[in-house]
Amino acid sequence: MTATEWQTSLATQDAVIENGVVMHFGNPSAELLATTKTNVLCDLTHLGLLEINGADAASFLQGQVTNDVKLLVGNNAHYTAYCNPKGRMLALFLAFAHHNHELGGHLHLQLNRELLEPIMKRLKMYVMRSKVEIKDVSDSPIKFGLNGPEAAKLLVPLFTKAPSQDYELLSLENGAILKLPATGNNTRFEVFTDAANAPTIWNALKAECQLVGKPCWDWLEIQAGIPDITSATQEQFVPQMLNLDLLNAISFKKGCYTGQEIVARTHYLGSVKRRTYLASIESDRTPLAGDKVMDGTKNEVGQIVRAAANPSGSFDALVEMRIDAKEAGSIYWNDAVVTTKNLPYALES
């Protein structure tokens, strides 16, 4: 069963699919409201997945990304940035290994699917004589997300256990489970499984959950303070601007990687002058990644990183901006006020 075939099966469950993305299951506003109150289940076919194989896979990636690939030993995941030589981000990866890469397992990089082809092409340019194979496996494992107050409890009968720590990865007989950061009294997971097991697992979870579309998952990611890179925001941000140092997505102890000089200088000179904030925006129009935000004198001070409709009928967003501008007064997207809120992690200026 391919991802396309999987989504065809979801269409029989009232999934509304646009360009390969499950947008909702018939009632977007009710799904958003349910996301705040109960257990929700979401198809994640829209996420891209690269598989990095070969004897040199770990050492190759170590020279490409900001985090320490050697820490991925089969039971954990972490975020990591992929930068250009000027330290500006080309992509954000959620990196993990289903099995210890030193024992022959493979590494995976999950990313925004719209960036997959150009990023894969760029990575392959640097393989040269290394024993590395890079493949698009986005359609191989069936991926879905689970969030809610009873999410962990729902997984146990299906997998025998569930991970308890954020970014803990369990590889089990019928799939793998990755625990992701959540807010409130919820727990959040991504499930990876194969075509044979996917229907059974999905249907069992569906019986206890509200089915929701990608916008609900995006909103959950925003609440957790997890940024994203799109084609509109490539090469716009040094990793610290998106709080990646606060998300443990940068290693300052590992060896060299592309863009390291700029990233390290920003860290050691204490020169982080821009951060990403959680905000709400009251508007009838949807803020888009890359849209500029202004101060009261119409000077550009930052931009939208990602945004999604919220349950109250407006929008929540992650907004990158100058720290001094945020502290000086009101910030606007078009004519709408950008009202900042507390992130689930501490923001260090």
Residue ranges and their predicted role:
Residues 40, 49, 94-224:
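Acidic, low-complexity central loop/insert segments
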Residues 42-64, 135-155, 271-282:
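Short glycine-/aliphatic-rich beta-strand segments at the starts of folded cytosolic domains
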Residues 74-76, 162-170, 287-292, 329:
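Glycine-centered loop/turn motifs
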Residues 93, 242-250, 260, 264-349:
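Glycine-rich, small/acidic residue-mixed loop/short-helix segments
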Residues 190-280:
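Anionic-ligand-binding alpha/beta catalytic cores of soluble enzymes and soluble regulatory domains
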